[in-house]
Amino acid sequence: MNLRGYSYRLVKANKAADSKHIGVKLGRYCITNDIPVIQIAQQFSVSRMTVYNWFSGIVMPHKATVAQIEKLLSK
C-alpha cells in the first residue's frame, strides 16, 4: 500500500475506526487507491477537515452525501 499523501496517524486512525462507517470505508478506499483528500473534498463540496473526520470515523456524512459515497465505492 502506497501511503503517499497520507500520514501514518491518519492511516492508523482509519484502521482503528469502525469499518461499518461509510466515511471509514471511503477512507480505506482512498488510502488504498491513493486518491487525494482534496479531490474527495472538492467532489463532495466539503472541507478537507470534514473528509479527514469521515476517514477517522469521527463524523458521519449527511444522508445525501452517503448515497454519493456509496455510488463511488460501488465502481
Language-model regions, residue ranges each:
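A short, Lys/Arg-rich alpha-helix, primarily the initiator
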Residues: 7-33
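DNA major-groove recognition helix of helix-turn-helix/homeodomain DNA-binding modules
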Residues: 63-75
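Intrinsically disordered, low-complexity and often Lys/Arg-enriched segments
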Residues: 1-6
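Recognition helix of helix-turn-helix/homeodomain-like DNA-binding domains
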Residues: 46-60
